[in-house]
Design a protein with these regions (language model features):
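Predominantly soluble domains enriched in secretory-pathway, periplasmic, or organellar proteins
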Residues: 25-371
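Bacterial N-terminal signal peptides that target proteins for export
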Residues: 2-12
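C-terminal motif of bacterial Sec signal peptides marking the signal peptidase cleavage site
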Residues: 20-23
Length: 371
């Protein structure tokens, strides 16, 4: 089954990469913007996905406004991160996990960037969650499953099959909540998924599936206490994207008529940048929203970060959003042409721009602030 996935998707990746390179301006004579130190004390890791199939994922490090590019390679001169970094999380005080999708590994590092070990038997690995003792990783392989990894040994100790092409995963009070996408529907001959699988984390058995009625639960998923913010990407033709906010305590949910492609949480709110794409028009449309918790009241824009709105609207391709839990600073990345180096913007708690950083990496997408 795995060989079938790898051969098919290798063909898709090669074709897609050539199309992307042909369609996007490479902007060889790129103008480098000076990176001025921020007023924030944040120590921030920025995971750049790179281009699928190009083996060029990397991590940039922002240390109180000072940018260190290719940080992982500098800390590990004999290693490179791999192909398509897809997620990064803090497992515990001494361990960080990075899902490197097309390299089929989960890379572990210390907070200082030194590589520790890797789990290398979770093919097509996607998103990560942890309870401190175990790491949970979604995988598109073998019909879609979740792997449970002992963080002491870095070995897979159990698995559980879920829906097709599972994406986001969250741990809450002994249970795992997994957003199933069915994203390979057109290629694999199955329908898009609209369910969230609920697993017992101890036994790794699926307890139920919550049908949200919204297809293709693909993209970033944020957790704020008992609430999850899940993006429904639609089918890119007739079915519009949506946002699903799930209460993991009651297993009730509410659907909003805007996408949450890139989302994060701070305080009692979700902050959302939605990206809507239509094959009918070939056009991306971007929106911003804020969702209050627990009232689930939605607002246009990014509330107290409203001053950042004009800058975000000027970005070519917003590709990630994150608010530091330590400083309250808002970080937004711009992937630009997807085949060129990107930018990361830093805004303070009032949305005033504090810095703009030229990242020597493609598609900066995932953030982690270190304590």
């Amino acid at each position: 089954m795995y060989m079938k996935y790898r051969k098919w998707h290798l063909l898709l990746v090669v074709c897609g990469a050539w199309l992307l390179l042909a369609a996007c301006s490479m902007e060889v004579n790129d103008k480098v913007v000076d990176s001025h130190p921020s007023k924030s004390d944040d120590r921030l890791l920025v995971l750049c996905e790179g281009l699928w199939g190009m083996d060029n994922s990397c991590i940039a490090y922002l240390d109180q406004g000072q940018l260190i590019d290719k940080w992982f390679q500098k800390q590990n001169p004999k290693q490179h991160l791999g192909d398509t970094g897809n997620d990064i999380i803090q497992v515990n005080d001494t361990l960080i996990a990075i899902s490197v999708n097309w390299s089929n590994i989960v890379q572990y590092i210390y907070p200082d960037g030194r590589a520790v070990a890797a789990t290398e038997n979770i093919p097509n690995n996607r998103r990560l969650a942890s309870d401190g003792d175990y790491l949970y990783c979604t995988s598109y392989a073998d019909g879609g499953y979740v792997a449970k990894v002992d963080v002491r040994t870095k070995q897979v100790v159990d698995t559980c099959h879920v829906g097709h092409e599972p994406e986001g995963i969250a741990y809450y009070r002994g249970r795992l909540f997994v957003a199933n996408s069915g994203g390979y529907a057109a290629q694999e001959g199955h329908a898009y998924e609209s369910t969230v699988s609920v697993l017992d984390a101890q036994t790794m058995r699926e307890l139920k599936r919550i049908d949200t009625g919204c297809i293709n639960l693909f993209g970033q998923m944020s957790q704020c206490g008992q609430f999850l913010c899940i993006n429904s990407a639609g089918d890119y033709y007739e079915v519009a994207p949506r946002t699903v906010v799930l209460n993991m305590e009651s297993e009730e949910f509410r659907v909003f008529d805007f996408p949450a492609t890139y989302n994060c949480t701070f305080g009692n709110r979700f902050y959302v940048i939605g990206s809507s794409y239509s094959y009918n028009t070939g056009v991306y449309q971007y929106t911003t929203h804020t969702i209050d918790l627990p009232s689930l009241q939605a607002h246009d824009g990014l509330m107290e970060y409203a001053a950042a709105q004009p800058v975000i609207e000027s970005m070519q391709s917003p590709y990630g959003i994150y608010i530091s839990p330590y400083s309250g600073h808002l970080y937004v990345s711009d992937a630009r042409g997807y085949a060129t180096n990107g930018y990361v913007y830093d805004f303070d708690g009032q949305g005033v721009q504090q810095g703009k950083y030229y990242i020597k990496g493609l598609n900066p997408a995932h953030f982690l602030a270190l304590p």
